[in-house]
Amino acid sequence: MSEGGGRVSRIFAAPTRLCRWPALIECGVNLTQPLCEWMIQVARDRTLSLAWEVASLLTLSSSEVGLEGVGTIWPSSYSSEESSRNGAEQGRQLSIEGPFQGQNCPSHPAAALPLPMRGESQATSCQV
């Protein structure tokens, strides 16, 4: 394939398929293999950075962030045995233990929930 006359060279097309960004072809971006690999690495680094931010927040107690008595939302792995047993019945709703026991946390649309990693539960519970 030639690069002239609106055609795309193999060097241009292969990394574009790898990155799955067909819009870049329409914009006329000259996407090379090193550029594509760099873009993938930046995306991976950003994802890992966000994961670490969330993980560090999960280790904070309510008092450390000035939310005494409000409660803390924990992933299902931290929930009590009773909450785990009831998890199947609750579905995507959250349960509250402590001063707000018996009430339900507001439910969130499915699109707002992060997709669980392989082997991870979607159920989440609130604890104080």
From Swiss-Prot:
<protein>
    <recommendedName>
        <fullName>Saitohin</fullName>
    </recommendedName>
</protein>
<keyword id="KW-0539">Nucleus</keyword>
<comment type="subunit">
    <text>Interacts with PRDX6.</text>
</comment>
<feature type="region of interest" description="Disordered">
    <location>
        <begin position="77"/>
        <end position="128"/>
    </location>
</feature>
<dbReference type="GO" id="GO:0005634">
    <property type="term" value="C:nucleus"/>
</dbReference>
<dbReference type="GO" id="GO:0005737">
    <property type="term" value="C:cytoplasm"/>
</dbReference>
<keyword id="KW-0963">Cytoplasm</keyword>
